[in-house]
């Protein structure tokens, strides 16, 4: 028993030595830095200037289609909305409403949106009766056209809507699908 305990101590020793040395080196480096350099910044209050909104779309790539025919959304469209960051998501959505003024690429006219959360479903249905409200729903996901925009399942059935961009930049839904489990109701 004594032999195995000694072997165990010997095995742990190099790690303890390394971590101990690493800690002392870091603390010495920190101590050598003059206090003024370490200050967090000036204490003067910042002037609050209204920054112009950035309304440029961050991505315009189309979703790639695999050989089996299944659509795959690009990375930029896979923003994860959970209950935790739902409020932030809606804030971003409303802030990006101005992005609708950006002209979509001429070769990309349609987009499938998939909503798995009933809150988003109701927002979409509300938007369908008011064309101006389409804008934030589209621009929220980086203005990605011809893509399947996926929201993770929170609860309820899946509502899909195919959106078409008209030449005058207005939008309209040209197809609807509602899926529950494996059944699709068109």
UniProtKB/Swiss-Prot annotation:
UniProt induction comment: Up-regulated upon activation of cAMP signaling.
Regions of compositional bias (Basic and acidic residues) in chain numbering: 18-40
Protein's GO biological process: DNA-templated transcription
Region (Disordered), start-end ranges: 1-62
Primary role: May play a role in cAMP-mediated gene transcription.
Name of the protein in its database record: Putative transcriptional regulator encoded by LINC00473
The encoding gene: LINC00473
């Amino acid at each position: 028993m004594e032999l195995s305990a000694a072997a165990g101590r010997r095995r742990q020793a190099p790690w303890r030595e390394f971590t101990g040395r690493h800690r002392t080196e870091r603390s010495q480096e920190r101590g050598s830095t003059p206090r003024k350099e370490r200050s967090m910044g000036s204490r003067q209050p910042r002037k609050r200037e209204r920054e112009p909104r950035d309304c440029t779309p961050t991505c315009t790539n189309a979703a790639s289609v695999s050989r089996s025919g299944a659509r795959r959304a690009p990375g930029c469209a896979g923003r994860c909305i959970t209950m935790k960051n739902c409020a932030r998501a809606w804030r971003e959505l409303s802030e990006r409403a101005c992005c609708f003024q950006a002209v979509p690429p001429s070769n990309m006219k349609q987009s499938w949106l998939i909503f798995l959360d009933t809150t988003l479903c109701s927002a979409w249905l509300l938007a369908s009766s008011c064309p101006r409200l389409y804008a934030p729903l589209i621009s929220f996901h980086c203005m990605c056209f011809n893509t399947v925009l996926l929201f993770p399942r929170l609860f309820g059935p899946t509502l899909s809507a195919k959106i078409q961009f008209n030449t005058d930049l207005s939008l309209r839904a040209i197809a609807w699908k509602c899926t529950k489990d494996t059944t699709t109701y068109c």
